[in-house]
Amino acid sequence: MAIKTLKDLLAEGVEGRHVLVRSDFNVPLNDDREITDAGRITASLPTIKALVDNGARVILMAHLGRPKGEVNEKFSLAPVAEALSEALGQYVALAGDVVGEDAHERANGLNDGDVLLLENVRFDPRETSKEEAERGEFADQLVALTAENGAFVSDGFGVVHRAQASVFDVAQRLPHYAGTLVEKELEVLGNKVASAPERPYAVILGGAKVSDKLGVIEALATKADKLIIGGGMCYTFLAAKGINVQKSLLQEEQINKCKELLEAYADKIVLPVDLVAAAEFASDAENKIVAIDEIPEGWMSLDVGPKTVEKFAEVLATSKTVFWNGPMGVFEFENFSAGTRGVAEAIIAATANGAFSVVGGGDSAAAVRLLGLDEDGFSHISTGGGASLELLEGKNLPGVSVLES
């Protein structure tokens, strides 16, 4: 069944109606609680602006971090309310609670075109409860904020893979629609990448833990033409080939699984040929470029080397579809950012050459911004890390399937 979208809701009319919007405002903050990457906030603006311009009374729901079901000032959405006020050019009020007295009072007091941000939904343990009855109770209280004739817009793509109250259960209780962002993500990832990628199709996976991405690797190895593996997860694959990776990040319990994958997909999996080894895990650590089997004793690799970037770039240059998720090294340390930068630049070059490229959210999107790369050089930068991977894996996304019902 087709999913109704924001366009459908606007055609029905939203003037004077309370519209609950699930956004993704899970943005990184520094120690002074300043937002260091507002990408997700920027991505949420088209939906919010459209509702405001059409006279809706907008109630935003979102989470930040993992407060574990308790009110914790450290995870308050106050910095987000401030950033939204600035970006929208109008005051966005922050409720002092999620479904308490203050939230109700403020929701009841909204005028057409006003925006209210509820406090972090994960301050309530029922948001992430595994018990449907508990989530349902919380969802009922969220829906109660909308008065009569309310509607729900799902626009937090980064959370659609979660069966949580504000994502899944609220949608079951109100007329529901996909926001601009979710609609675009499903179109790009679902149609252009997952269903019918133009070939050759290359996937680049990085990031720390191989265990987090084993399911993805297995699923994509059958679908992609080339599977490039870098970042912290590549060392378990190198160890599976009998290489001593010294103190590099290693998940020994996954070595046999990596061996199986290397045997099954020998023609598809592409691994590093050189590395940037460091004496310790520090931004100013003594470091040198070495072959994969020449990491000095007691040292660790913190990035892929220049020959590896060249090798990966050759694969990307001939690809027509490219999906990238996960950095190639510890890009936050300048001395170990060249691998991630080199691969990102190779993807930009492939895109300029006609390839369709997607950056799969999370750390990769953060790396693009931190390294000052041209975001327009990629066809699409996704806002969902885990969600984009699960969509490509072919998994059921609760927050999407509920919109189809």
Curated annotation (Swiss-Prot):
Matches recorded under PROSITE patterns: PGLYCERATE_KINASE
Keyword ATP-binding part of the UniProt annotation: yes
Source taxon at top rank: Bacteria
Positions annotated to bind ATP: 213, 332, 361-364
Alphabetical list of InterPro entries matching this protein: Phosphoglycerate_kinase, Phosphoglycerate_kinase_CS, Phosphoglycerate_kinase_N, Phosphoglycerate_kinase_sf
Example GO molecular function: ADP binding
Compartments, as annotated in UniProt: Cytoplasm
EC numbers: 2.7.2.3
One GO biological process term: gluconeogenesis
Key words, A-Z: ATP-binding, Cytoplasm, Glycolysis, Kinase, Nucleotide-binding, Transferase
Binding site for substrate: 24-26, 40, 63-66, 122, 162
Pathway per the UniProt entry: Carbohydrate degradation; glycolysis; pyruvate from D-glyceraldehyde 3-phosphate: step 2/5
Pfam family, one: PGK
GO cellular component term, pick one: cytosol
Protein name: Phosphoglycerate kinase
Gene that encodes the chain: pgk
